[in-house]
């Protein structure tokens, strides 16, 4: 894979306002991006306005052919802690590419001393004290290994929050460094759902994971729009759930609960569960371990029976 690390053109502003860079609780960010000229500026503006700035922000451009790289480079002239890693264009999008590019970015970071590592999508907008408040959650809970705010699509209600408060979407995952090192990095899953794998693995390692519901983030682009129409996406979600080892009972209950919640009503749930059943019948190959499957199914049945709270607890 060919890559080009574009260095900032100016270095005389690197240590401006060093207090905002958090000398004692510093963090770094990595953002995979591909053709996000309509949204990337919102995300960059949100980051540079933070009350606690990252020590380094590495953006990995996956062969962007629009103005994405130009927009990023215009900010790099002033904010030298923003870096750009350019990759050659590829023909087809895939879920695993996001993980591979994020991993490449993490391995390419030049900053060695930091306490937290954040993954950040390129189509988000958030409050100026987002990272300061998020880091505050880690200060309050020494066992918290992975956390993040709630990404709400533009136009959707910010009052209806996810029931599952222990899984953090990949768009906003923020790690205590010890946790990220303990889970041994990110796991690419061809069917998607790598972020769920990350959260579950962190809990298996004894860390707490938390969706921080008082930190709401605007998600500016409809999710998963590059992977086909609505029904094709529902089928793929069923395939994904099988690949992640979901318990069949949990999957049926989940799909039943969505019968009249998601359009097209009824048929969406039927297509979703059909993708799961087809993968089961054809014995689709999984990349996860039996230990992982046992753990995730135990958590799911605990949620169904009310034996597990919405926030995970570490193993003892």
For every predicted segment, state its role.
Residues 45-54:
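Short, acidic, metal-binding catalytic loop of nucleotide-sugar glycosyltransferases
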Residues 61-70, 89, 124:
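A conserved acidic beta->alpha catalytic loop
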Residues 92, 125-160:
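Conserved donor NDP-sugar-binding/catalytic core segment of glycosyltransferases
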Residues 99-116:
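Active-site nucleotide-sugar/metal-binding loop of Leloir-type enzymes
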Residues 113-125:
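Short beta-strand-to-loop acidic/aromatic patch adjacent to the donor-nucleotide binding site
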Residues 169-184:
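Conserved nucleotide-sugar donor-binding
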Residues 191-198:
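Acidic donor-binding loop at a coil-to-helix junction in glycosyltransferase catalytic cores
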Residues 233-316:
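Non-catalytic, C-terminal membrane-associated alpha-helical segments of glycosyltransferases
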């Amino acid at each position: 894979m060919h890559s080009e690390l574009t260095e900032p053109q100016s270095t005389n502003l690197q240590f401006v306002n060093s207090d905002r860079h958090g000398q004692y609780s510093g963090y770094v960010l990595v953002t995979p991006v591909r053709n996000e000229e309509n949204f990337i500026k919102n995300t960059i503006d949100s980051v540079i306005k933070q009350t606690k700035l990252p020590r380094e922000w590495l953006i990995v451009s996956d062969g962007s052919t629009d103005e994405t790289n130009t927009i990023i480079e215009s900010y790099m002239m002033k904010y030298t802690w923003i870096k750009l890693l350019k990759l050659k264009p590829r023909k087809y999008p895939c879920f695993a590419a996001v993980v591979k590019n994020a991993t490449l970015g993490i391995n390419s970071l030049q900053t060695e001393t930091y306490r937290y590592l954040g993954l950040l999508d390129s189509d988000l907008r958030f409050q100026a004290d987002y990272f300061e408040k998020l880091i505050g959650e880690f200060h309050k809970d020494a066992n918290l290994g992975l956390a993040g705010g709630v990404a709400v699509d533009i136009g959707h209600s910010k009052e209806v929050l996810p029931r599952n408060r222990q899984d953090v979407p990949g768009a906003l995952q923020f790690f205590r460094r010890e946790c990220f090192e303990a889970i041994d990095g990110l796991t690419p899953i061809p069917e998607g759902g790598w972020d769920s794998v990350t959260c579950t693995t962190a809990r298996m390692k004894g860390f707490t994971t938390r969706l921080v519901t008082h930190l709401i983030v605007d998600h500016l682009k409809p999710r998963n729009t590059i992977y086909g129409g609505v029904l094709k996406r529902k089928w793929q979600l069923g395939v994904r759930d099988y690949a992640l080892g979901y318990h069949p009972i949990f999957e049926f209950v989940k799909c039943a609960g969505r019968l009249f919640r998601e359009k097209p009503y009824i048929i969406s749930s039927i297509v979703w569960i059909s993708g799961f059943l087809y993968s089961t019948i054809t014995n689709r190959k999984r990349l996860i371990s039996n230990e992982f499957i046992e753990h995730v199914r135990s958590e799911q049945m605990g949620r169904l029976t009310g034996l597990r709270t919405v926030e995970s607890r570490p193993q003892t």
